[in-house]
Amino acid sequence: MSNGPITRTVRQALILDLLEQNQVSSQMQLSELLKQRGVDITQGTLSRDLDELGAKKIRPNGGRAFYAVGTSEDAASSTTAGTREKLRKMLDDLLVSVDHSGNIAVLRTPPAGAPFLASFIDRVGMDEVVGTIAGDDTVFVLARDPMTGKELGEFLSQRRTSL
């Protein structure tokens, strides 16, 4: 993680990543995992982030409870408008510039922002996107035929402001 301050969107994307990779059973445990990644966070901010992300404690088959986001019940009840709004916020916070080559849109982000933006684009499941590859500050987004990389880049730039 970079040494400078991070945006709320990047912090929340990191929280999502940690919740996907670990069975986090408490806010204290999540706070420690964030600290290991260089993010110091207050309990109040962490609690708000978890609430905004829709993280809920689940206890599968009566086992140990842990935080999860996007369970099958949540996915069934989530609205397209909410997903579009989250994508707009992510693009507003992270998209610095757009370029293209062939059927690839090249998205530039601040340092450490690309993995979070790519992961979210993949999770949204846009029909226009085949998949993403992310470095530290660059995301390659592969456009689905017949769309070109230029058209996809323009589409994402427009979503940034029009949603």
Swiss-Prot record:
Q: Which Pfam family is one of this chain's hits?
A: Arg_repressor_C
- Please indicate if the UniProt record lists Signal as a keyword: no
**A GO BP annotation:** L-arginine biosynthetic process
Q: In which pathway does it act?
A: Amino-acid biosynthesis; L-arginine biosynthesis [regulation]
The primary site where this protein sits is cytoplasm
* GO MF, one example: DNA binding
**The family this protein is said to belong to:** Belongs to the ArgR family.
Give the function comment from the record.
Regulates arginine biosynthesis genes.
The protein depicted here goes by the name Arginine repressor
Q: Which organism is this entry from?
A: Corynebacterium diphtheriae (strain ATCC 700971 / NCTC 13129 / Biotype gravis)
Q: What is the gene called?
A: argR
